[in-house]
Amino acid sequence: MSRPFASAPARGHRQGQEERERRSEEGGSVPGPRTFQVVSPVVTPGQEATLFRVEAVEEGEARHEGDVAGIGREFQLLAEDIVEEVEVVADEEQEQRPSQELEEKTVEEQGQERPGGPCERQELDALQALAALQVELSSEREQNRRAYVQFMRKNHQRRKRHLARRSTIIQGIPGFWAKAIMSHPQVSVLISDQDQDFLGYMMDLKVQVRSHPPSRCKLIFSFRDNPYFLNSVIIKEYYLDITGYRARRSTPVHWFWDFERGAPSRRRDTRSLNFLNWLSGHNGPESNRIAEIISEDVWDDPLKYYLREEGSSVRDN
């Protein structure tokens, strides 16, 4: 690369020497040497020519010719350093330009893939299809729920009619419920002589199950006048959950005085679990199990246990 300032110091040196000689002969003062100050480069990228704006600053003291020559050489070195620095800057700019273009291209490609790329369009289509299918499933589930509720309502009404008719028929069979209860194999082992006597006063049994949470079961026993207690109705209520039956409450039994505090032969035997003790409280270890047997076995099919001792001739016919 050509260096435009290579010859400048030589010409400046000769012209400065002639000027000093001429002024010395004329008797005038010789101005001091000038220091050249580079103010700013004018760089044109990709071209070798480099222009500088140079200002001359006049010094107050005269220098020798050797000093002037030194200044010229310093200026030459300074110009060479500036040219080399400009070349390095230009090279760095050329190196940075391809990397910047590559980076811009990468960002551009990523921007094109994100908003409207094939993968995103596929995912959007799949989500739309899934949403449409979910609407259909929700609608079908709601229809099934309504159909189930309607079926259960109809089934409950039909069962209620059947139970009412069954109760009417059982009223014509004296001691039906007492015999059905005492004939169950798991209850029969608890029945005492006293139980057999007081169950003879039992008129009716009803079981009410509430399925809405919390699920509950009510056992309603109806009695005619008897020598044991004043109650005509005794209700035992239980909670129903995954663990089985759990006692909730029971109607307090109003015993006759002679049965509770009278002669020992008439007193209620509270030392063991029997049906009368179960009916009057929830303290027995098998209290919940007895409630489950009556509610799910005896109530669902009382005729099965009523005929247990007499055989199955009625069913066979």
Swiss-Prot record:
Coiled coil: none
Cellular component, GO annotation: chromatin; cytoplasm; nucleus
Gene3D superfamilies assigned to the protein according to its UniProt record, in alphabetical order: 1.20.5.1500, Nucleosome assembly protein (3.30.1120.90)
Alphabetized UniProt keyword annotations: Cytoplasm, Developmental protein, Differentiation, Gonadal differentiation, Nucleus, Phosphoprotein, Spermatogenesis
GO biological process: cell differentiation; gonadal mesoderm development; nucleosome assembly; spermatogenesis
Compartment(s): Cytoplasm; Nucleus
Xref: SUPFAM superfamilies: NAP-like
Chief location of this protein within or outside the cell: cytoplasm
Domain of life: Eukaryota
Post-translational modification: Phosphorylated.
Disordered as annotated region, ranges: 1-39, 91-118
Tissue: Testis. Probably in spermatogonia.
Biased composition, class Basic and acidic residues, residue ranges: 15-26, 95-112
GO molecular function, one term: histone binding
Family from the record: Belongs to the nucleosome assembly protein (NAP) family.
PANTHER family referenced in this protein's UniProt entry, alphabetically: TESTIS-SPECIFIC Y-ENCODED PROTEIN
Function: May be involved in sperm differentiation and proliferation.
Protein name, per record: Testis-specific Y-encoded protein 1
Organism whose genome encodes this protein: Bos taurus
Gene (name only): TSPY1
